[in-house]
């Protein structure tokens, strides 16, 4: 039976982004790191460099504790290739409204490198 509704195709990069945001909102750092980051993955920001599952889990726990909540106001830019994701979003936390920038280098659907910034 024909319908006027179009199926929305979710790309691997969009799925990764959606899961990343969901786990951050749910404070699910274990699942976030275990499912989205390689064992030796590295996160690079201007404030620090963090490498490995244990350090990443500690980093995200502390990060979420400081922010308390994350509300995505808009996904301003998003681009992906078969092994990269790069996005800009406007978010609100208890610290205020900011623009965040995140780039991921992926291997087998998991991050090997995560570059992040806030403005």
Q: What does each model-identified segment do?
A:
Residues 29-81:
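A solvent-exposed, acidic/Ser-Thr-rich amphipathic alpha-helical stretch
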Residues 43-44, 87, 113-114:
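Short hydrophobic/aromatic-rich beta-strand segments that constitute the beta-sheet cores
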Residues 99-119:
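Short beta-strand edge/turn micro-motifs at domain boundaries
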Residues 33-36, 81-83, 104-111:
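Short, solvent-exposed coil/turn segments at beta-strand boundaries
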Residues 86-94:
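Short beta-strand segments that buttress and anchor functional surface loops
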Residues 71-73, 96-102:
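Short, surface-exposed coil-to-beta transition loops
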Residues 2-39:
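Short acidic-aromatic low-complexity motifs
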